């Protein structure tokens, strides 16, 4: 399986620029301290939301039910052996955020 690992900044809220399949996107990662989980969103190059507020759960295609022509064709997933992704798990290497191209 060929996939791209996407670095999740060690911040409670961040927006990163990324190029996927020849197009520019922005990914937003937000830590929900009250609930104890990560959320992510996809924005186009202008910062317009394509998908927002998706709870990051391990080993599940996070955008399975959210597909559009203007989004990257593939799935986003959190790869880990853990049952949930904690605040420091991406930074500590216990989890990876990945894009698997279709």
Q: Which residues fall in each region the model found?
A:
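Short beta-strand/loop motifs in extracellular/secreted proteins, especially
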Residues: 14-16, 38, 95
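C-terminal charged interaction modules
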Residues: 87-102
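Acidic, aromatic-enriched beta-alpha/helix-loop junctions
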Residues: 33-79
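Non-cytosolic beta-sheet module surface loops
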Residues: 20, 30-33
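Short, charged/polar N-terminal "headpieces" of proteins
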Residues: 1-26
């Amino acid at each position: 399986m060929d996939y791209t690992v996407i670095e999740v900044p060690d911040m409670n809220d961040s927006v990163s620029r990324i190029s996927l399949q020849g197009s520019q996107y922005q990914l937003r990662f937000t830590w929900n301290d009250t609930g104890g989980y990560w959320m992510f969103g996809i924005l186009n190059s202008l910062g317009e939301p394509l998908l927002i507020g998706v709870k990051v759960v391990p080993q599940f295609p996070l955008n399975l039910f959210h597909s559009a022509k203007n989004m990257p064709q593939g799935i986003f997933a959190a790869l880990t052996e853990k049952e949930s992704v904690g605040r420091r798990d991406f930074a500590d290497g216990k989890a990876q955020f990945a894009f698997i191209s279709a």
